[in-house]
Amino acid sequence: NDVFRNGVAATLTTTDGASRGSQSRNSIGTNGSYFFKGVAQEIITYASDESDNRLSIEENIGGYYDIPLPGLLDENPGAAAAYSLRRLRQAYTGSAIQVQRADNVGGTTDIGFDGYGDLDTAALTTAAAGNSMVVTTWFDQSGSGNNATQGTSANRPKIYDGTTGVIVENGKPAVDFDGGTDTLTHSSDIALAACSIFTTLTAVAAIRVWYGETDQNYLATFSGNVTCTASTSQRNAVHTPSGQTLYNYTRNGSVGGTWYKNSSPLTTTGAQTNQTLTLNSIGGFSSYKHAGPIQEIILYNSDQTDNRPSIEDNVGDYYGIEIAGLLDQYSGAAVAYSLRKLSNSYTGSAVRVQRADNVGGTTDIGFNADGGLDTDALTTAAAGNTMVVTTWFDQSGSGNDAVQNSTAGVRPKIYDGTTGVVLENGKPAVEFDGTNDVLLTGVDFLLRGTFSVAKATGTGSVFGSSGGAEFFRSLNSTQYHFRNNDSIKFTTDTTVQSLLYAANDTTSELAVNGAPAITSATLQTDGFDDFRIGNKSATSTEFLNGNLQEVVIYETNQSIIRAGIEANINFFYDIY
């Protein structure tokens, strides 16, 4: 069981009752021995696990009762500066912006947030009283005090139009910079060696600087490129501005740096050296100014590669920006089986299911709006019956679906007629019975970068090949065995795991839950023939006893981008 207080997971001091089933009492205010003293406003009880819906339920309640909930900076703390038109931190009690009439008549007004943590547009509208309003100060929510201000009325960006109302972009408030004179400047420079900078904006012109200090320190979109310049060293990426976009520039403080657009990496050029990036002006500098809305800028003076999926998902979800899936960011997979959507361009389903008793036809189950398995559609199709997987669709685009045409009880389960959707760590899973469940592909390929999310019990193969010389198996609750020409056995203290197998010119390696597990000096060259999921080989009685959620396989070495792939997987499945 999990307990949350105002959206934050509570630390449980005991696990007593964690496995208890139904509760017999239905009285409010007492359990028969202890009585509640205080006021109660709302109690809602579900007879089902609502983990997937918890955030939306909490947001609804928190918004109505004006209870601040955790924000992006609670989940990913440590920002050097953070400017936004939504509340980013639960403990933040300040305002979002300070505004004044564009004609400089009257005083300033601080505009905060409504109960849902959004900009208080009602207060902004009241302050405007039909006049255009501009931003005098954009408050820093990081706690560092780097408020960005503009003392000259004519150089202030607009937040409210006297004719059309609140400036919005994709339905959310935005600060509109005119591309001419508008800037907001903080008095202290922010110097960044290692850094991650997340910016949500819309560029309406090809050559625009959105954050900078001088012509040697800035972030900008130029014709055909998005650019970071630190001192005299540039890091560019081929890019054409197109509508509302989440940009992220990340570097580790030594060399290089990577540009991401809506979470998808851009091809970078320019060998940026270890130069400090100094910033102090939102909207640009000199004659290089940004034209268009800016909604959020968050700066970290550290490399946030491990937290990037979490930050980008948070931003994308709030602003309605479609964030790139795993295969959009890291393309080229030979096969990809998952119960989440791995690519924004994928239009197929996740699985095809049928009743376990083979009554009725099959039903294709796709994804919900958040990219997870459409468990509502699965529950409807089940109609109280146990459901099994007949096909696990390949999302790589190669058409290598894993199927089981036999109806003789050899299909893995995805829905239990009594307990509902099969789950592992709160996410849907395909359950293999350890006896005879297997999905077949009929495909032969090399394994040079293999990522899987599985929980196995006892001895059983997560996947294998027709001949049985190549497989990945669980030996017991803590030890695993990978074989592909050379055997690699390794031990781990956890059974839910992310696996990497990658071969290069001289060695092969395995990593579990983001950490290297073992390296073999033997290059593993054999290919998997007739790749199968849940079984060691065509003649073996060794089957997977446990749950499988994702298998993504590349035929090329993925060591360089392993950390990014594992961060993506771990963010979704919360493995380690």
Language-model regions, residue ranges each:
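Parallel beta-helix/beta-solenoid repeats that form elongated, surface-exposed shafts/blades used
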Residues: 34, 109-113, 117-125, 216-219, ...
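Surface-exposed or flexible loop/turn and strand-edge residues in extracellular/cell-surface modules
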Residues: 23-25, 35, 40, 94, ...
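Extracellular glycan-interaction surfaces
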Residues: 1-18, 45, 80, 85-88, ...
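Surface-exposed, flexible loop/turn segments at secondary-structure boundaries
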Residues: 51, 265, 305, 539, ...
